[in-house]
């Protein structure tokens, strides 16, 4: 299963991916968000989290965030994750695979960190080994018992402060 997922997600353009235990993610969510999540994905067991890098581009083009200069990333991520979702639906025909990116009842950064996709930065963003925090997160929530990739612990950055120093919000 991991080999298939690695192949599919690499083809989709993900720089990192992992699978978090749904119960561990639900445990940190407030009751209303947990209820919404379980309405959308009954029998939730796992969250497949994938990080997709975005171009850093030319920072001299004005005060517009780099990610906002291209096509809407929600559409891009949905398109990139469709082959992954279809393959999983074929492999697990009785299970739901619900796509989320940003607009989600799940704490996606927490889930991705729990899955081992990256470390949690002091700025609250996920920091991946190859793209830093310049990533978009996509999640497939499912009742399928995919193998969990994380060890159940959140890795945090070493506290160098670089993310805070370079944060445009101060």
Tell where the protein language model's regions lie, with residue ranges:
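Auxiliary alpha/beta "docking" domains used to position bulky ligands
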Residues: 1-156
């Amino acid at each position: 299963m991991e080999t298939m997922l690695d192949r599919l997600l690499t083809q989709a353009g993900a720089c990192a991916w992992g699978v978090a235990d749904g119960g561990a993610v639900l445990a940190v969510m407030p009751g209303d968000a947990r209820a919404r999540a379980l309405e959308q994905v009954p029998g939730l067991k796992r969250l497949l989290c994938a990080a997709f890098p975005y171009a850093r581009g030319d920072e001299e083009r004005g005060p517009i965030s780099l990610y906002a200069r291209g096509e809407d990333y929600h559409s891009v991520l949905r398109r990139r994750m469709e082959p992954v979702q279809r393959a999983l639906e074929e492999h697990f025909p009785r299970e739901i695979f619900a796509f989320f990116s940003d607009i989600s009842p799940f704490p996606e950064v927490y889930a991705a960190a729990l899955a081992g996709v990256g470390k949690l930065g002091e700025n609250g963003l996920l920091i991946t080994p190859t793209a830093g925090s310049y990533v978009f997160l996509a999640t497939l929530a499912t009742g399928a018992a995919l193998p969990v990739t994380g060890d159940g612990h959140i890795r945090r950055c070493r506290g160098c402060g670089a993310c805070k120093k370079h944060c445009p919000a101060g």
